[in-house]
Curated annotation (Swiss-Prot):
FMN binds at residues 10-15, 78-80, 113-119, 134. Keywords: Flavoprotein, FMN, NAD, NADP, Nucleotide-binding, Oxidoreductase, Plasmid. NAD(+) binds at residue 12. The keyword Flavoprotein applies. Pfam families: FMN_red (PF03358). The lineage of its organism: Bacteria, Pseudomonadati, Pseudomonadota, Betaproteobacteria, Burkholderiales. Substrate binds at residue 98. Binds 1 FMN per monomer. InterPro entries: Flavodoxin/NO_synth, Flavoprotein-like_sf, Flavoprotein_WrbA-like, FMN_Rdtase-like_dom, NQO. One of its GO terms (cellular component) is membrane. It is an enzyme of class 1 (oxidoreductase). One of its GO terms (molecular function) is NAD binding. This is NAD(P)H dehydrogenase (quinone).
């Protein structure tokens, strides 16, 4: 079976929750799954004063870790319609892996969180996907086989480009059952694809 890395950055825990759901879906296929986060770049005093969720259980990843997986699913909150600076700084350091073609042919996917419905979810997913395509990866999104993203009964995240959640302006809304199911579904599809390609 394949090895899957769920790599994320989360400020208040919303993306962390999606990451765990992505991992659950991937594990359901029999894949070996690790969840890791990128290093925090905000000074500890600022993070504490801003009420960042600093007690996240996932270990911190290194750029070299990326070479050890068949699939890499990347999640980050939106920062003004793009990926967070923490994730950007981490991916920018992967130039050596890119130069050697280490990530070519691996399976990739993206997920995100925004404060509002129209706060840049798809733009952020595209910016993650652009990185993964430059690395030579094959992208798996969240197709409409996840029926939840089509509901009109409640506000939900989700896009064909990846799982998403809407956190609210103060971070007061946690990922809904439908959004977590979308993340699980995407994780399952990514792992199934990697299992077919890498056994």
């Amino acid at each position: 079976m394949s090895k899957v890395l769920v790599l994320y950055y989360s400020t208040y825990g919303h993306v962390e929750a999606l990451a765990e759901a992505v991992a659950e879906g991937a594990r359901a296929t029999g894949a070996t799954v690790d969840v890791k986060r990128v290093p925090e770049t905000v000074p500890a005093a600022v993070a504490e004063a801003s009420h960042f969720k600093v007690d996240q259980k996932a270990p911190v990843a290194t750029v070299e870790d990326l070479a050890n997986y068949d699939a890499i699913v990347v999640g980050t909150p939106t920062r003004f319609g793009r990926i967070s600076s923490q994730m950007a700084a981490f991916l920018d350091q992967a130039g050596g892996l890119w130069m050697r073609g280490v990530l070519n042919g691996k399976v990739g996917g993206a997920f995100t969180s925004t404060a509002t419905q129209h706060g840049g979810q798809e733009a952020t997913l595209f910016s993650i996907i652009a990185n993964l395509l430059h690395f030579g990866m094959t992208i798996v999104g969240l197709p409409y086989s996840h029926q939840g993203q089509m509901t009109l009964d409640e506000i939900v995240g989700g896009s064909p480009y990846g799982a998403t959640t809407i956190a609210g302006g103060q971070g007061q809304r946690q990922p809904s059952a439908i959004e977590l199911e979308g993340a699980r579904h995407q994780g399952e599809l990514i792992a199934k694809t990697a299992n077919k390609l890498f056994g």
